[in-house]
Amino acid sequence: MNKVRHFIDTQDLSKKEIFEIFRLMKMLKEARYCGAVPELLKNKTLAMIFEEPSTRTRVSFEAAMTLLGGHAQYLKPGELHLGVRESLYDTTKVLSHMCDGIMCRALKHETVLNLAKYADVPVLNGLTDYNHPTQAICDVFTMLEYMPATKNLEYEDIKFEDIKVVFIGDRTNVCSSTMHITTKLGMNFVHISPKRYQSPQEWVDIANENIKQANSGSVLVTDDLEQVKDADIVYTDLWWWVDQEDEAEERVKAFKPTYQVTPELMKKAGQQALFMHCLPASRNVEVYDEVIDSDQSIAFEQAENRLTAQMGLLVYYLYPQIDKSSNAVKDYYRGKVEAFMEHQDRSWKQRYTYNNDYAETKNKK
């Protein structure tokens, strides 16, 4: 068996590896459209740990495992108390012995890091308070699939230095992941937000190191909406989450109306700009209906590619770990078990016949 690899952060991947995942995603998407997805994970099980619920993450991973011939087991919020009733180490070891992979949507990034530390099977990061790498893989794949300048090119032929991605709104985990994967590929990333909600310097430092390694791209954090001009992608996210409900009023005052994605803002970006949103969206809050439902929006194509991304990531990380037994070995164990059960069946029938005969004899007496 190969050394176990985990998917925790796109920073752990090289540019070449990202392209490999994209190519795999493209093949599997084409196969799904043809109704011909190969069952590469047949009879395999993915444990899905959710510390908070999610529609797209759960449905996409479950559907992906089903299409690939496997099974996804949903461990819902409150059903599995990591590190409470049982240590995280013990839980991880048990899941490693019963399942072929673990996906975790965690409240704290440390949880996923520790899962990966203890696991003997691949761990996939379904979201933490720090990042959302499965979303990032999906998003860049979608950008390159739909931008006119890139959709017909091989990934190595794309001029990433000419691509500008503008993220408007709060410094969410999606913002973090988008900043880091785009700069790793050498794109230009801009985060536009009120100063209080801007990306922290440590995120920018990582982006700058990515730019240095890629030898192209740029990163800018600003409150200046003029920087949306000439954007290829305009991206936004929710302004607050469930655990930030007490801040909702304050956040609305900070973002509305200046940082709403409106038709006027998209016009300022330019007709080439495509709109993206990781969803769920608060319509007419961070984005107007007229934008998310417009021809410039690829938000729902982006959502579909969550399934594409999960298929690609599951195959990329789980398939190399599978013990690929020959048909001869499979036939051997099938025959061995069937022979055992046939013997048990005969023994059961003999006991059943003996008991019936004994009962009939006793009744006659």
UniProtKB/Swiss-Prot annotation:
Its main location: cytoplasm. Disulfide bonds: none annotated. InterPro entries: Asp/Orn_carbamoyltranf_P-bd, Asp/Orn_carbamoylTrfase, Asp/Orn_carbamoylTrfase_sf, Asp_carbamoyltransf_Asp/Orn-bd, Orn/put_carbamltrans, PtcA. It catalyses: carbamoyl phosphate + putrescine = N-carbamoylputrescine + phosphate + H(+). Keywords: Cytoplasm, Polyamine biosynthesis, Transferase. Putrescine binds at residues 277-280. The record marks 29, 145 as: Important for structural integrity. Pathway: Amine and polyamine biosynthesis; putrescine biosynthesis via agmatine pathway; putrescine from N-carbamoylputrescine (transferase route): step 1/1. Homotrimer. This is Putrescine carbamoyltransferase.
